A protein has these predicted regions:
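Bacterial N-terminal signal peptides
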Residues: 1-9
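Glycine/tyrosine- and acidic-biased, solvent-exposed loop/turn segments at the edges of beta-strands
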Residues: 10-147
Length: 147
C-alpha cells in the first residue's frame, strides 16, 4: 500500500507545470492552488512551497541535497514579502533579509560560518538607509557607513 501512495504522489506532482509566465498550472491548465514540491534526481526534497493562483504565497522552504534546510522564504501573492533566512550546508544561519512587496525593506544580517555577525544593513522600500556596519572575523567593528 505504501508503494501505491508514493506512486500516486509522484504522478499527481508531475501534473503541475511552470508556464512561461512563471506561474504554476494544474493539468487542466488552471492556475494551481496548494502545496508544490520539487525533488532532486535522487528523490530528496529540493523545495516545498504553497501556491495560490499559480504563484508563491506564504512560506517556501529550499533544501540542500543532504536534507538540511538551505533557505526559508516568505511570499505574498508571488512577491517577496517578509523574512528570508539562509543557512549553510551544516545548518548554520548565514543570512537574514527582509522584504516588502519584493523590495528590500528592514534590517539585513550576514554571519560567517562560525556564527560571527559580519554585516548589518538597513533598507527602506529598496533604498539604503540608516547605519550599515561591518565586523571582522573576531567580531570587532571595522566599518560604519551612514545613508
Amino acid at each position: 500500500m505504501g508503494l501505491v501512495f508514493v506512486m500516486l504522489a509522484v504522478i499527481s506532482q508531475a501534473q503541475i507545470t511552470e508556464g512561461n509566465d512563471g506561474k504554476y498550472y494544474a493539468e487542466n491548465n488552471a492556475l494551481y492552488n496548494g502545496t508544490y514540491k520539487e525533488y532532486y534526481t535522487e528523490g530528496n526534497v529540493r523545495m516545498v512551497m504553497n501556491l495560490t493562483n499559480g504563484v508563491a504565497d506564504g512560506k517556501a522552504m529550499i533544501y540542500f541535497q543532504n536534507g538540511n534546510l538551505k533557505e526559508s522564504r516568505s511570499y505574498k501573492a508571488g512577491k517577496f514579502d517578509g523574512l528570508w533566512t539562509t543557512y549553510n550546508n551544516q545548518g548554520v544561519k548565514i543570512a537574514q533579509a527582509s522584504y516588502t512587496n519584493s523590495k528590500k525593506d528592514g534590517k539585513w544580517y550576514i554571519w560567517d560560518g562560525n556564527s560571527v555577525l559580519r554585516y548589518e544593513m538597513q533598507y527602506t522600500m529598496g533604498q539604503k538607509t540608516g547605519t550599515w556596519k561591518e565586523w571582522d572575523e573576531k567580531g570587532s567593528l571595522v566599518k560604519e557607513r551612514h545613508f
